[in-house]
Amino acid sequence: MKPAWALLRLASPQLPIGGYSYSQGLEWAIDSGLIQDADAAERWLADQLTLNLARFEAPLLLAHCRAAHEGNWPHLQELAERHRASRETRELALESRQMGYSLRQLLEGLPELDEAARELLASHHEPGLALAWALAARAWQITPDDALAAWLWGWLENQLAVLMKVLPLGQQAAQRLTSRLLPTLEAAQQQAASLSPEHWGSAAFGLALASMAHERQYSRLFRS
């Protein structure tokens, strides 16, 4: 099978893990008036990529994928525990668990997953998304770097979908925003690949506060 098919499969919005249900605080930022137009949305997403994803979420996910690729199960378990402990709010924790569980359900029914990976997956009833994503990449023979690229792309697409539904932002405007953010997306992947574990870390207080406020938001479309 061509590697491109597997990569497109992993990055596809049709992957049945429910990513479209979550906004990661973006819905609250729009509702509160912090984001009122495409320029403000661009600043919010660029900050998330630069200050949060590139410094912690992306390098942690990449480490998951490398450990799964190498079959280093003890290290993968340690990384999964770190990922679970780093969820700062109830909504963000539930998001990771629900999406990870959905991907687990998918992988269990597919023949591509090898026995060692299947045993590890079976030991986690509600794996975090990072663990399940890494095992999916292993099953579909996707390199760790490409698996991270697929995850970053999926994150950006989901955020743009939130903007189109809530701001609202038109489809052509969303594509223009994508073009402006692609260099930042690329830089985030490169930075993630260059960081050693002792340099992982972010202090995304705005994201945590937005997520906590969203938990109490009166009317909402998204689960985070």
Curated annotation (Swiss-Prot):
Keywords, ordered alphabetically: Chaperone, Cytoplasm, Nickel insertion
InterPro entries listed in its UniProt record: UreF, UreF_sf
Annotated coiled-coil segments of the chain: none
Localisation: Cytoplasm
Any one GO CC term of the record: cytoplasm
A GO MF term: nickel cation binding
Domain of life of the native organism: Bacteria
Self-association and partners: UreD, UreF and UreG form a complex that acts as a GTP-hydrolysis-dependent molecular chaperone, activating the urease apoprotein by helping to assemble the nickel containing metallocenter of UreC. The UreE protein probably delivers the nickel.
The family this protein is said to belong to: Belongs to the UreF family.
PANTHER family per the UniProt record, alphabetical: UREASE ACCESSORY PROTEIN F
Function: Required for maturation of urease via the functional incorporation of the urease nickel metallocenter.
Protein's UniProt name: Urease accessory protein UreF
Organism of this sequence: Ectopseudomonas mendocina (strain ymp) (Pseudomonas mendocina)
This protein's encoding gene: ureF
